Amino acid sequence: MIVAERVTGVARSFIHQVGISRTAWLRAAAASLLLLALPFVLRLDGRAHADWLQFLGRFHPTLLHLPIGMIVLVPVLEIAGMKRPALREAADFVLRLALALALPTLALGYMLAYGAGDTGTTVSRHMWGAIVLCIGLMLCLLVRPAWAANQQAFIYPGLLVATLIALVWTGHEGGSITHGSD
């Protein structure tokens, strides 16, 4: 019980210090829990499911390049924004748009794997990487305002780097699914 109280206290302090509204925090936590629950609710069982899932899932390769480009663009805009502040505002917009596109990309990828009955270690790693990537984007959006207001120096850049690492890893796993591991 004492550990739970300490963790709760640290979390409240962090949320207050970073300036995250309770509503935004709860929305991000709920969305993260839904993303984390997805593989357990709809297990990739190796059996093909409804054809319409596979049909919609085939749009995953079409859509996925947009959020990838936007996620890579965000740190470029943040760095360039040191000299031109308007670019920092553009970075916020691009980050929001990247998340808005990453979530349906994740859903389409899951529809493709579930509808086709795909399984395997690479598919699983790609799926979990995409989930971590989306959660990382949500966390970046939550803490970015405090960083932009110079209240927190390292949390947002650290999360952004971690999100970029998740992007590279997830993209590599997706490429291995499409083109093979060699």
Predicted feature locations:
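Polytopic transmembrane helical bundles with strong interfacial aromatic enrichment
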Residues: 2-182
